[in-house]
Amino acid sequence: MDTETLKKNLQEKMDKALKVLDHELKGLRTGRASVNLLDSVTVEAYGSKMPLSQVASLSTPDARTINVQVWDKSMVSSVEKGITIANLGLTPATDGQLIRLPIPALTEERRKELVKLAHKYGEDTKISLRNIRRDGNEELKKLEKDNIIAKDEHHSLSEQVQKLTDDYSSKVDSAIKQKEQEIMTV
């Protein structure tokens, strides 16, 4: 493996870690309605579990409501059950094939819990980044040991790997800070 491929692989892995963080943060509830809240909801449909988005269309008519338009009338009760089981703190109100989910305002205590959870997600992502850095540095040591790169080049590349890790770590910090502001805004 050459050094360019190594750097590219490290960057791809770090991008993937950031995408995972982004997905986790989208699932955190802010005071606003967002269809992303329902990403984790699965529904018992036609003998198997399916994501909610495959049995209904989701929309947000206003900042405090999510509408779930179920396509098959026989699925309405399964969708309600799936939303309830997901334990999102949402109470479904059914009107024919339309399920309305009013989003209650977050309490101060719940906001603080969500901020803690966001920080935990951020810390988990930073741990992933450090593990990726460690793997990259081990690969560099192996390349040096196999006389593919010189000691000076190894040192220079290690610094580049560290800089890459620092850059991604600061991206994590800014994503967490932004989510914290979203959550704490009443």
Swiss-Prot record:
TM ranges: none
Leader peptide range in chain numbering: none
This protein's GO CC annotations: cytosol
Keywords: Cytoplasm, Protein biosynthesis
GO terms for biological process, alphabetical: cytoplasmic translational termination
One term of GO molecular function: ribosomal large subunit binding
Family matches, as CDD domains: RRF (cd00520)
UniProt-annotated location(s): Cytoplasm
UniProt cross-references to InterPro entries, sorted A to Z: Ribosome_recyc_fac (IPR002661), Ribosome_recyc_fac_dom (IPR023584), RRF_sf (IPR036191)
HAMAP family tied to this protein: RRF
General function of this protein: Responsible for the release of ribosomes from messenger RNA at the termination of protein biosynthesis. May increase the efficiency of translation by recycling ribosomes from one round of translation to another.
Family that this chain belongs to: Belongs to the RRF family.
Name by which UniProt lists this protein: Ribosome-recycling factor
Species whose genome carries this gene: Rickettsia felis (strain ATCC VR-1525 / URRWXCal2)
Gene: frr
